[in-house]
Amino acid sequence: MMTSNILSRFLPPNGSPSVYETLRQQDAESNPSDVEERAGLEFEDDRRTQFSDRELEEAMVDAARDGIRSPSPSPSEPFLTQRSPQRTSGTATAKTGGRRRKHSRPRWMHQDPDDGDDDVPPSLLVEGHQDDDEMRSRLPPPPPSHRHPQRELSPAPGPSSRADRARWNTTREQLPLHNDGRGQRPGVIWSLGHPNLASVDPKEKAMWLWANVENLDNFLKDVYTYFLGNGIWSILLNRGLSLLTFAFVVGFSTFLTNCIDYRNFRGSRKMDDILIQQCTKKMSMSSTFLLWLLTVFWIGKAFQYLMDIRRLKHMHDFYYYLLGISDSEIQTISWQEVVSRLMTLRDANPATAGAVSARHRKFMGSQSKQRMDAHDIANRLMRKENYLIALVNKDILDLTLPIPFLRNRQLFSQTLEWNINLCIMDYVFNDQGQVRTLFLKDTHRKALSEGLRRRFIFAGIMNIFVAPFIVVYFLMHYFFRYFNEYKKNPAQIGSRQYTPLAEWKFREFNELWHLFERRVNMSYPFASRYVDQFPKDKTVQVAGFVAFVSGALASVLALVSIIDPELFLGFEITHDRTVLFYLGVFGSVWAFARGLVPEETNVFDPEFALLEVIDFTHYFPNHWKGRLHSDEVRKEFAVLYQMKIVIFLEEILSMIFTPFILWFSLPKCSDRLIDFFREFTVHVDGMGYLCSFAVFDFKKGTNVISQGGTGRRESGRQDLRADYFSTKDGKMLASYYGFLDNYGGNRPANPSSRRQFHPPPAFPTLGSPSAIEMGNIGERLERTQTRHGPAATFMGQQSGLGPGFGAAGFGDHASPAPSILLDPHHQPTASDFRTANRSALYPRFRSSRPVRPITDPIEDDNESPSAEIRRGAVKKSPHTTTGSSGGAIGTSDSNLGESWRMNLIGDELDKDTGEDGENVDEIAGNAGVLGLIQQFQKVSKDNRGRTTVGI
């Protein structure tokens, strides 16, 4: 009875199909190249459509009368089919017994007799038929293994009788519809009259590979990985050294554990006295099995790297010939420049693959590569990472330890992150990197949740078998890597770094890894300074005493050893412990204790140091407001910024506790995980399914708020809905600002836009602690820590809170400057920056300019509907003039789906002016200065309305 209960948790109920069978069936039926079909816009009834015998005969008669000849199969079709087997409809239907789907228009679109006019005639295409023939002549014929007899012999897939096949063969003999080249020897003809692909010009070959890219997500990932690896030679060197490192760790560990007799170590004078002869033959069975297992893994990894050299060579040619970036330049070029050249290549070379069918060419040209600006590239590269960022931000993952005395402690390590990607991401996403449409329907919610729960349990079981080997390897690798550093500088034992959970909390949507790493690395000096500043008087006193005693003993021993080194270094202070041993002990103790004592010249200002940390991390929870100086905030930050040795110990212990988290904690949130992917996934034309927060759609969740009394009466319910559909602590708005900081400014460098030198901050005197309490730190920040980032051209002068947190809306520019790295539908508009006083995030910050104080945290539109309901309307700041770009973030109606809808600055200004009771038309009626300003504003509004669209 107990066995049946245990098995029932892993096996599906009787009579119900497995959720994996449903997922595989849906993946097989879906067309990965048709993004619109994956959005659920395809007819289900049309999938069962099949050509009848009468329709086939009529088609043959029409073809004979019109003299139509179907083009021969493209030489590249087997190549494309080999890379993506699911695209071959004939193969899929042969396995499933289904019939070919007839792609039709969705139900909500009527049939238009002029639809055929939308297609570009073949004569006007860039490649034309001559280019097709030239491309076919240069490509090798398909190998026999890649031919599809069903495609050649049958006009339509599906079961066919002998009579139908005989009639079809007779028709083919009478009407040569296909030049299949039967009876010829294409291999011999090719080898005699055509060169092979190896002799093709590398630039033309790179262009052909670029034009025939199927999966743009995977291609852009290869481009980005190649950029991070600094070229083909650096990547090959890194892989070779990683293989050598792995072999050295395994070999040296085997030598230390099996080839040395530690019982003879004492008293031995030679290496031969402690070595075990032919130690590999005397190894235990478990050690031998582990060594063979690691050897097979090493050989497989080396073979994988060798096979990947061809792909790296293709990527090298793509960078060198199409982007104009050499291996020496790739180490210094910025990613923004790479994106700019990708967009230039996109515009100069449209997706016109001559060896691709018309339907596939239309897909690639109109959807795939035309949606490839900085925003689209970031969304493709971080399609999965954006979901994980949102999961961590909304606290959906239950990472608590199921241990009685550690239930309130979260554990998130690299091992657990790998298991989450395996259990969740590989479950939700298919092989093409798209979200499975089954997760977007609530009809399979229970089955998907049970399947996810079983995946967690199965992964926990597998971790039990894998954990011992991983623990041993990481222990040896960490020891070999860091022991020498700790020996040279013992103070490094107390060095700190951010935990893996902190990195996912700090990372923003659409922020690539190298940009995030640069931003976080700049915060380390300020984070260490902040942690070391807090009062630890007792610890400092004890550490000072220990440093004094150990330093005195070490100095005396060192002085005596200098006087007579030959005699004194061999002198035993205790039994078998010489002076050299105690010199090392006392020196290490002194270095460690001295590292705990702060410098006497340091000025105590924890609030200033933490603001500098927030400047780069962009992490500022709501409960930190007004408490930056408190010890509670320090403890919470210390959990995110721990010592390296503690992080390593947690990583080792996580291999023991990870199975328990997978068994008990994560299965509890399986329902919420399924609901999250269903409710926070949006479809973007040409891109597929994306996380709703990554598209920066600020109007999601707020359009349902009705205006007037209804919205006020239901404000409580709307607040709950807005909280559910919004990020915490203004994550999406901070990501939006950070993205514009990275990809925004394009104006040429001039003396006014260059980074200016600022003197060191003027710290308050020790005799005036009230200056800190009164908020003078904000004035110092504004005066000394102003930064000019890439987006300073459209954000104005940023505050000392760093990239993404400047005071937008109070600069000299009335509207943000467009970016060459963003397409028109992603360009920032002035309505996106209306009174976006980002410096008002921090209540202790005060600008030198008169601004309206705001004590609320960063909030986007969908994160503050209750405040909008309470106010009833957005009121104009008393310090904002009519010509400024003031307003609330997201007041524009424009978003990614409706980029043509927007509210210009003038509309909001007219509305605000009406609220203030001033009749601008009446004032500007005379032909005076105000009248000219009013006319100028209207002209500017009309011009922006024609050229700028909202994100």
Swiss-Prot record:
Top-level taxon of origin: Eukaryota
A Gene Ontology term for the protein's cellular component: endoplasmic reticulum membrane
Oligomer status and interactors: Homotrimer; forms a homotrimer with a central pore that forms a path between the two membrane leaflets.
GO molecular function: phospholipid scramblase activity
Free-text note on domains in this protein's UniProt record: Forms a homotrimer with a solvated central pore, which is connected laterally to the cytosol through the cavity within each protomer. Acts as a lipid scramblase that uses its central pore to function: the central pore opens laterally to accommodate lipid headgroups, thereby enabling lipid flipping and redistribution of lipids added to the outer leaflet of atg9-containing vesicles, thereby enabling growth into autophagosomes.
PTM info: Phosphorylated by atg1. Atg1 phosphorylation is required for preautophagosome elongation.
Main localization (coarse): membrane
Family statement drawn from the similarity comment of this UniProt entry: Belongs to the ATG9 family.
A Pfam family matched in the record: ATG9
Function comment: Phospholipid scramblase involved in autophagy and cytoplasm to vacuole transport (Cvt) vesicle formation. Cycles between the preautophagosomal structure/phagophore assembly site (PAS) and the cytoplasmic vesicle pool and supplies membrane for the growing autophagosome. Lipid scramblase activity plays a key role in preautophagosomal structure/phagophore assembly by distributing the phospholipids that arrive through atg2 from the cytoplasmic to the luminal leaflet of the bilayer, thereby driving autophagosomal membrane expansion. Required for mitophagy.
BP GO annotations: mitophagy; piecemeal microautophagy of the nucleus; protein localization to phagophore assembly site; reticulophagy
Transmembrane segments: 240-260, 289-309, 543-563, 578-598
UniProt intramembrane stretches: 456-476, 645-665
Protein name: Autophagy-related protein 9
Cytoplasmic topological intervals: 1-239, 310-455, 477-542, 599-644, 666-951
Keywords: Autophagy, Cytoplasmic vesicle, Endoplasmic reticulum, Golgi apparatus, Lipid transport, Membrane, Phosphoprotein, Transmembrane, Transmembrane helix, Transport
Ranges annotated as biased composition (Basic residues): 97-108
